Amino acid sequence: MSGGLQQSPVRAVVPGSPEWLRLAPTIVDLFERREREQRLLSDKTSDAPRAVDWIYANEDGARRIYYFEASRRVASASADVDHDTDPPGTVRITVAGFLHDASGRLTPLGTKSELRWEQDGLPAGPSRPDFLPLGVVAQGERSVWVMKGQSGTSKWFTLYDVSTSGTRALLTARADRC
């Protein structure tokens, strides 16, 4: 690539590996903080277990940046509803974000949270991250992460500018328009 741009790959961090186990407590802390800030925690959700679902890493020399997704699933079925008009489902609380690893010190670079409702009894589809990192283009201290998203048959790409000062979405384009 020209103009001082460098392309670098992203790798999946293996669940249960020492690297995963080192990152998980920080990710859980960020999840809990985001839940409190966004008021996503209630008596019904607090007992549901949290899970670190995905972690991806990009390494450029001594600099390492991670993308993660974590979630909590809560059954939303209630005994006093009409299941014909309000079918049972699961509320999924998701927190995703980026971490900078500077010599073993993890610094959050931005997180986002979402609530989703998934109807029980329907095929869940393939298990995949909400955003699949495809690669990173870097220039100096800035990195642009190329991410692919999918919901049902809808696909899109999003570019995230990730730097030590934070994260911002630069562009989102539907896959059928690329």
Model-assigned labels for residue ranges:
Residues M1-C178:
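Exposed acidic/polar residues on beta-strands and adjacent loops within beta-sheet cores, strongest
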